[in-house]
Design a protein with these regions (language model features):
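Short consensus segments that form the blades of beta-propeller domains
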Residues: 107-124, 201-207
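Repeat-based blade/solenoid architectures
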Residues: 152-159, 163-177, 235-237
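Acidic/hydrophobic-patterned starts of short beta strands in beta-sheet-rich repeat architectures
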Residues: 87-100, 184-199, 262-271
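Eukaryote-skewed repeat-based solenoidal scaffolds used as protein-protein interaction platforms
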Residues: 170-208, 212
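Sec-dependent N-terminal signal peptides
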Residues: 4-13
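Surface-exposed loop/turn elements that mediate protein-protein interactions on large endomembrane-trafficking
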Residues: 133-148, 217-227
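Beta-propeller blade signature
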Residues: 123-135, 208-219
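Acidic, small-residue rich beta-repeat scaffolds with periodic aromatic anchors
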Residues: 18-87, 205-294
């Protein structure tokens, strides 16, 4: 079987924007992309992330929602719920995030930041469930659900576990938002995105990785069909200045996903483009894997 480099490693081989600034105050103006500016604001100024998962539609209670989307989870372990309108006909994509126990859930909610946060006992994201449903009249009509938490469905996690010997490549440690751009991967198939990531902390800074996962509906189940790095940001402290401030080395890489007109097995090929040097990588549908592969 042909062996591929881990997806993150492939991403980091691509050229990145890099610059050095003279002190911490100069970092925000050196960051090129809004993702990095938000990371800096959260890390250095304590800014709260936006509600990337939205809110349940008016009239839909948390109790009713989690009874369908995650029937085997204990309601006492709930951290977060949310939903966003998707397309027409009253369709929504919703989430429910659970901790392993009530104490961990209460601790997570105490420091609530609108994300499905890290489970510090295993270094992974807490249990995030997805559901697609219709809400009209008002009544919940089920369409599809993930059945398992995303950290078990994620192709990114599987690749990170099985293929990587790079210590910087890890399973996702948190989920941040729904990405409902119109990812039409086939004429009759619309996918939706979930964004998450993980970070590395250094004595003089850190690195942050954002991953886009695309999910689609197959029968009444939600399956992961694509996962890859879409943003990388690092801030590493450098030399000391005479005035006691310290230089900072900033690096960024950002990628966008394009749907190509060419098809493989009925699905449009995906092109991930590096915005820095316009290099790209093509992903095609694999019938055997039932997802995209490089």
């Amino acid at each position: 079987m042909k062996k591929f480099l881990p997806l993150v490693l492939l991403a980091l081989l691509s050229p990145a924007f890099a610059t050095t600034v003279q002190n911490l105050d100069s970092v925000p103006s050196a960051i090129q992309h809004p993702e990095g500016k938000q990371i800096f604001a959260e890390q250095m100024a304590g800014a709260t992330p936006a509600k990337g998962f939205g809110e349940l539609p008016q009239g839909l209670s948390e109790k009713q929602w989690i009874a369908w989307v995650a029937p085997n989870e204990d309601p006492d372990n709930l951290i977060l719920t949310g939903a966003k309108s998707w397309g027409k006909d009253g369709k929504y994509i919703g989430i429910a995030c659970f901790a392993d126990n009530k104490a961990d859930a209460e601790q997570a909610k105490k420091y609530a930041d609108n994300t499905c946060p890290e489970n510090y006992s295993n270094g992974r994201a807490n249990k995030l469930y997805l559901g697609v449903f219709s809400w009209q009249n008002p009544q919940l009509t089920p369409i599809a659900r993930s059945e398992k938490p995303l950290n078990q469905l994620s192709e990114w996690n599987k690749a990170a576990e099985k293929e990587s010997d790079d210590e910087s490549v890890r399973p996702l440690a948190y989920y941040t938002k729904l990405d409902l751009a119109p990812y039409r991967i086939a004429p009759d198939t619309l996918a939706f995105g979930v964004r998450g990531g993980y970070s590395d902390a250094y004595s003089g800074g850190g690195a942050f990785y954002e991953v886009l996962e695309l999910y689609t509906i197959k029968d009444s189940k939600i399956i992961n069909v694509f996962s890859n790095l879409v943003y990388y940001y690092s801030d590493i402290a450098g030399d000391w200045n005479k005035d006691g401030t310290r230089q900072h080395n900033i690096s960024e890489s950002k990628y966008i996903l394009k749907m190509r007109s060419a098809k493989t097995h009925g699905f449009y090929d995906l092109e991930r483009v590096n915005l820095q040097d316009k290099s790209s990588q093509i992903f095609r549908w694999s019938e055997s894997l039932q997802r995209y592969a490089p």
